[in-house]
């Protein structure tokens, strides 16, 4: 089972058991993740950078997908990861690598 399938299963279980929280969080994300003064692409890169530095695997899957869907290239994602490594040190390299693997799959 790949990372996206695992995340989908976990999200389904969360929605079934916490529908109110899920709905409110979804509304929040719908408000935040759209073009504004920052483009959706920029917001997804920021979210992925945060996901990598806080080591949230599900967030990494979600926002790597978001980056690709928003039009990010592998080069843009990789450059953002340079900042993650500069700010997060060695652990950021592990989680950045996970995101690169996912992005590589999605960009094929």
Description of each model-found segment:
Residues 1-43, 94-108:
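Acidic, glycine/proline-rich low-complexity segments that act as flexible tails and inter-domain linkers
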Residues 56-59:
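Short cysteine clusters
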Residues 52, 66-69, 86:
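Short basic/hydrophobic patches in alpha-helices and adjacent helix-turn junctions
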Residues 62-77, 103:
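Iron-sulfur (Fe-S) cluster-binding segments and ferredoxin-like electron-carrier domains
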Residues 29-30, 47, 64-68, 81-82:
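Amphipathic alpha-helical segments within well-ordered protein domains
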């Amino acid at each position: 089972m790949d990372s996206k399938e695992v995340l989908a299963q976990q999200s389904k279980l969360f929605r079934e058991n916490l529908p109110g929280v899920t709905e409110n969080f979804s509304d929040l994300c719908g408000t935040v993740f759209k073009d504004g003064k920052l483009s959706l692409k920029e917001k997804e890169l920021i979210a992925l950078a945060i996901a990598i530095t806080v080591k949230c695997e599900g967030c990494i899957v979600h926002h790597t997908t978001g980056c690709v869907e928003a039009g990010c290239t592998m080069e843009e994602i990789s450059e953002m990861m340079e900042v993650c490594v500069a700010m997060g040190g060695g652990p950021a390299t592990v989680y950045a690598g996970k995101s690169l693997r996912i992005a590589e799959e999605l960009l094929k």
